[in-house]
Amino acid sequence: EEFLGRAISHRRSEYFLASKCGHYVESSENDKKGNSWGESDLRDKEWTKKTLIESVDRSLRRMKTDYLDLIQLHSCDLDILQEGEVIDTIERMKEAGKVRFIGYSGDNEAAEWASLDSRFDSIQTSFSLLDQGAKDMVFPGVNKTQKGLIAKRPIANGAWGADKSPSTYASEYFRRYEIIKSNGIDVDIDLSPIELSLAFALSHQNINVHIVGTANLSHLKSNIKQIETEQLLDEKTLLQLYEVYDRSNDNWVSQT
């Protein structure tokens, strides 16, 4: 956030600026040490009005702006969502002009519930050819309530087609890929594994934003080219990828 503040605060009108709240907030003792995160026992992780306000105010301060276009409750459990205080608190900040839109970022039952709640303007949830649960659990509510839909991890962290897990973060996706591969993948298409992964996500046109992170400029250019050329999958290929996922699925849940 501090990086963004330095880079774009003077060009604020050019950007749709989104952030999340509900993650760890540093204590005053931690701040004095000059440590951005500190030890876990110095973190306040309660879903309270106080910590939510502090989290949003911190984002505004760090990004050198007086409002966020989108604030997202990040991985808030279903029972906390249903209590209502967290949403009420964010709504008060919206009324105060600190945020324009309210979103939920998470997965599974909590995302399904949030997808049907009219107070949320958008849902950010995991979706890829190795994480298809949101298609049946979250997409219907988003479509019904006409929310914005943001797909995180849309290329499954590069696990599809990999020889080994690309990272610890991708280990569950790689495990799923190994199972799917052992069950037989009958997809005849002239795309690299990453291109196939991105094409699968892009072929779901109810998704408004795909979060495809990279630190490699050539990868970024390749992704942009694929989007510009509208390199999508036909219905037959999509159905094949749905089928092999469903056939391999052993109660898989969406990964946060």
Residue ranges and their predicted role:
Residues 1, 79-85, 109, 132-142:
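Active-site-adjacent beta->alpha loops and helix N-cap segments on the catalytic face
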Residues 1, 5, 56-60, 87-91, ...:
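Generic structural signal for well-ordered alpha-helices
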Residues 1-23:
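N-terminal binding-site loop/beta-alpha segment at the start of enzyme catalytic domains
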Residues 4, 17, 59, 68, ...:
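Conserved, mostly hydrophobic/aromatic
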Residues 5-13, 60-64, 115-118, 144:
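Acidic (Asp/Glu)-rich catalytic clusters
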Residues 6, 117, 137-256:
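Structured C-terminal cap/extension of enzyme domains
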Residues 21-25, 74-77, 108-110, 129, ...:
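Active-site-proximal loop/turn and secondary-structure-junction residues that shape catalytic pockets
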Residues 30-128, 203:
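Glycine/proline-rich, positively charged
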